[in-house]
Each structure stands twice: as C-alpha cells, then as structure tokens.
Amino acid sequence: MLSTQNEKKTLLTKYSIVIPAHNEEDFIAITLNSLVKQTVLPHEVIVVNDHSTDKTQQIVEEFTAKYPFIKLRNILSKGEHQPGSKVIQAFLKGYEIIDPNYDIIVKLDADLDIPFNYFETILTHFNQDEDIAMVGGFAYIDKDGKWILENLTDKDHIRGAFKAYRKNCYEKIGGLRAHMGWDTVDELLCKYYGWKVVTDESLHIKHLKPTGASYNKSALYKQGAAYYALGYGFWITLIAGTKLALRKKKPTYILYYLKGFFEAKTNGTKKMVNRDQEKFIRNYRWSKMKQKIKG
C-alpha cells in the first residue's frame, strides 16, 4: 500500500543495551556513567555479570539502585577469556530478559567511554533511512596520552565492542552467533539481505582496554577457524589474515590464522552461513578487494 502525505513515519526511540562483563571493575563504572549521561537515555540496560571474581557485581548494583532502567543478571561460565563465543553466550543470556518492545538492540563491551550524544546520533541515522540495519562509530585508544583511532578494521566495519541493530534486521539474520567471527558475519548477512551498514566518523568511543589485550594463543587459531566458518576459502583467508596480522604489527600471526583455518576445514567445522550466503560473501569480498586495487 502506498503511503499518503498524512501518514507519519513512526520514529525509532527505544534502544536496549546488553553488556557482557567479566572482571571489569576498572571500567564498568565509566561505561555505565557514560550511558546515564546520554542525551537520549536507553530504554533498558542489562549488564550480564559473567562469573566475575572482582567488584564488578557490587559496582553494577550501585547503578541498579539508582537507575531503574539498569538491570543486572549474574551467570556462571568458564573463567578464561575466549573471543567471540563466551561474550556472545553472555549477551544472549541478557537478551533473554530484555523488554521485547525495543526498536534497536545494542551489544556493548564493558570497557567503553561513550560520547554523550552517541545514541541520539545513532537513532537519527536509523530514522533517516529504513534500509539501515546497523550503525556504529569508531574506537579510539590511549597511546602516550593521546586518543588515536584503533585501526584494526576497514572504516566500513562496525567494531564488535559497540554494535547497534534495527530489530527486524537482528531477527532476520537470526541474532548473534556464539562463534568467533560473529561481528563480521552479522554485517555480511545484513548486506546479503539487502540492508545497509553505516559508520559515523564523528562518533569517537574511547576503548579503555585495547582489543586482544587478554587473548591467549588459542585465540589466534580461532581467528583462522572463524575465516573458515565465514565461508572465506583459502585465498580470502590468506589475504584477510595477512592484512589483520600486519595491522596488529604481528606478521607471524598469519601462520596461526592459517593453521586454525586448515584445522577447521579438516575437522569439518560447521559454517555460520549456508551455501548461497557463502557464495555472496566470497563475491562481496573479492569485489571489495578489486575496488581497493583500483583505488
């Protein structure tokens, strides 16, 4: 049905946040303080305290006592840090208890300092174009007293630390996958279904604990396994892995990535996408590479 001039578009205003947290006593208060100072407040904030042994729970409880929209859920999982699976398992535990009447679902890390107008700006983007599925800013890290861009990904990619999804898009892609590479496959599937992913360079988020600071060697293998699960194939894995290793200034990491890729292939690791999606992803990746070569 064609819309008439008298019809008004319903504005998206309700954004709900889930924050997985494990031993984040040094940062969680900064993150929550930045949320309660937003020009547009969250509809709901769920902090999932995942087996913390420090004062994370106590700090969050101080906020829940003061702000009714902040809630705490305590869960128990294995103590070691595993990129991807552990954090998304915690996120999904939080997602289970959110008010389903949200417009935008947000996954945040517990070590961020977010600018006061961040979510007002995010909502503006969503309301300007109904085809926008995801919006995010950029991570900045402290280096010698200066906040510089944490340049680990292309500028059209939203970091896993701060993902915001339109509700019907989140549901269409089947939610988040508890697997390393979840923060890449989500965007690729959005594009597969014809949605747009938007990054806003005016939004600078302070990332208080740089990415990968607490990963062990097995995480490097998991990165390679993630490339396989994304359906990249060997050549795209080689190129993407080399690029990531060089950005991390650890060129030997590519060897671990490739080992993880081949182990996943040999073991028959289940992919995160079906064959049609895999074909789309490979074509998309190759086309992006060709664009960069052409300049």
Model-derived segments and their meaning:
Residues A219-G295:
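Non-catalytic, C-terminal membrane-associated alpha-helical segments of glycosyltransferases
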Residues R159-G174:
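Conserved nucleotide-sugar donor-binding
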Residues M1-K37:
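N-proximal low-complexity "stem/linker" segments adjacent to membrane-targeting elements
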Residues N101-D113:
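Short beta-strand-to-loop acidic/aromatic patch adjacent to the donor-nucleotide binding site
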Residues K14-S16, E44, V185:
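Cell-envelope/extracellular polymer assembly enzymes that use nucleotide-activated donors
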Residues I88-I104:
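Active-site nucleotide-sugar/metal-binding loop of Leloir-type enzymes
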Residues L32-G79:
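Acidic donor-binding segment of Leloir-type glycosyltransferases
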Residues G79, D113-L149:
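Conserved donor NDP-sugar-binding/catalytic core segment of glycosyltransferases
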